[in-house]
């Protein structure tokens, strides 16, 4: 692929490189504040990202693979997102309201064999044809499946992490797949690149700066 000079350098717009940068330049600054008051610095965020990435490697995930995330807005969802993108894998979040045919359609179209799922949502998977989905990391509890293999939440964050990125991740690589609402038919899978997210941010939220919390 011919590199277009209008595209920012990967270090400026690809999430994994940004986390690594801030872990050096702003190591002790707060990066994330969770519900309940727990905080992660940028250094801690990189450490946890690398641990989650290693957990996915141990499940066979590699660059370009699609992995489903069916969770509320919580720590495990952040770990799933950041860990996958650190590998260059594709984060595929699912609306927590989905069930039945809507859920089945999204799971099958996602082309994912692995999911990270909140225990409260897991029983709905027994009511659908899950396609090539075979393994589920269950967070916040346990779950039993008819045709899927359940894995404990501890598999998401092993004791040690990767020492660095395993592959080069480019601005035009797919960062995540977002499904449309499905109001005019089955939900469509929208492939969003790192560059798309980088370009959209300042346009959508021009009033946010480094001192804001979102």
Question: Where are the model-predicted features located?
Answer:
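A short N-terminal helical cap/helix-turn-helix that marks the beginning
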Residues: 9-31, 47
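Conserved adenylate-forming
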Residues: 56-61, 159-172, 177-214
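Conserved AMP-binding/adenylate-forming core of the ANL superfamily
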Residues: 30-74, 78-82, 99-104
């Amino acid at each position: 692929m011919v590199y277009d000079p209008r595209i920012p350098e990967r270090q400026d717009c690809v999430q994994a490189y940004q986390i690594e940068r801030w872990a050096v330049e702003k190591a002790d600054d707060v990066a994330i504040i969770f519900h309940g008051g727990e905080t992660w610095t940028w250094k801690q965020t990189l450490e946890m990202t690398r641990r989650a990435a290693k957990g996915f490697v141990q499940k066979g995930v590699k660059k370009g693979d699609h992995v489903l995330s069916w969770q509320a807005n919580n720590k495990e969802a952040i770990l799933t997102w950041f860990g996958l993108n650190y590998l260059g894998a594709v984060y595929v979040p699912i609306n927590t309201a989905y069930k039945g045919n809507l859920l089945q359609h999204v799971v099958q179209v996602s082309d994912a064999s692995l999911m990270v799922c909140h225990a409260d949502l897991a029983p709905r998977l027994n009511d659908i044809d899950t396609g090539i989905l075979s393994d589920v990391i269950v967070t916040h509890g346990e779950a039993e499946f008819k045709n899927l293999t359940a894995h404990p939440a501890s598999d998401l964050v092993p004791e040690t992490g990767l020492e660095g990125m395993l592959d080069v991740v480019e601005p035009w690589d797919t960062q995540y797949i977002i499904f449309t609402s499905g109001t005019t038919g089955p939900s469509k899978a929208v492939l969003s690149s790192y560059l798309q997210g980088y370009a959209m941010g300042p346009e959508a939220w021009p009033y946010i700066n480094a001192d804001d919390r979102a």
